[in-house]
């Protein structure tokens, strides 16, 4: 039985920098928080436990990256260089590039290679205090390759000190062998892929890319209906490039989240509020593809829709492995406040996964997953660009990452 009192710390237990304790302690037993609060109120039952002095550092919940595509083969830096030289995305696609090139590389990679490539993208997130990650499939687009991606995602959670939740995104794009036959491909997703992967226990949620260049409302709803037959929660890539009504559809199905949302309108915001659907904003993609349409943050505030922030880490539109950078981008590009972005990577991000009862906040009865920061103010988490701020990561009461000793 391991018992530890973490003390001499400043605590932000709910991810809200307006709700903090300046001199706090956390009592942890066998990886679970049994008490936390003002150090002066530490119960006598814990007074004799071994102590871990954090020297006045800030402690927040472990960060949650709630929308990633971390598992894939290859990268597309050469295409990035082509686009900078003026080659259009359409021309790159005609040359066999774009998402098809990632599908090709992912299908060709074996599990060991895919694991190594994906682990290299996960490790920087862990070093920034991330203890929970969502990972989507969607670059295999056939049963064997989607299975391989989800198996690798599960392995990352088993071999790294991070909790991984998997999302089946078979309806991400149309694979080359189904060109011109989108409905037939959705048949494959709903009738072959999802049943097999769900039966194997590889799927925690189901996503769909509902967009003019993705799948229609009708096709998206078929995927949602299939997910519901397996009692799997749903989420949606919606209103990124146009307002197609995807968010309203997601809300009707009580989606955990709707993500991107640059073209979201008031009716969609109202539907999200009614359904309890979280808005996941992805500033990395907005920045990388030079979008100009801002997500409707004022509407989301007015309707009190919870807003999460994530990396959207992927090879084509957001090759990002820094959640702290996304916090900075959300403040500078989207005009979000520091409290909004910190909750956006803690409590609201956990809610976007349907896991607010487990992650995103620190309280008695929950796993002792937290990040320790070398900062004077929590605003620094969104302020610095490229500066390593995380001194220590604690998962289930054990230090799993240390950058430097606190003093």
UniProtKB/Swiss-Prot annotation:
It is an enzyme of class 3 (hydrolase). InterPro entries: Amidohydro-rel, HutI, Metal-dep_hydrolase_composite, Metal_Hydrolase. GO terms for cellular component: cytoplasm. Fe(3+) binds at residues 67, 69, 237, 312. Its EC number is 3.5.2.7. One of its GO terms (molecular function) is iron ion binding. Zn(2+) binds at residues 67, 69, 237, 312. Keywords: Cytoplasm, Histidine metabolism, Hydrolase, Iron, Metal-binding, Zinc. Coiled coil: none annotated. Binds 1 zinc or iron ion per subunit. It catalyses: 4-imidazolone-5-propanoate + H2O = N-formimidoyl-L-glutamate. N-formimidoyl-L-glutamate binds at residues 139, 314, 316. The keyword Iron applies. Pathway: Amino-acid degradation; L-histidine degradation into L-glutamate; N-formimidoyl-L-glutamate from L-histidine: step 3/3. 4-imidazolone-5-propanoate binds at residues 76, 139, 172, 240, 317. Catalyzes the hydrolytic cleavage of the carbon-nitrogen bond in imidazolone-5-propanoate to yield N-formimidoyl-L-glutamate. It is the third step in the universal histidine degradation pathway. Belongs to the metallo-dependent hydrolases superfamily. HutI family. PANTHER family: IMIDAZOLONEPROPIONASE (PTHR42752), IMIDAZOLONEPROPIONASE-RELATED (PTHR42752:SF1). This is Imidazolonepropionase. The gene is hutI.
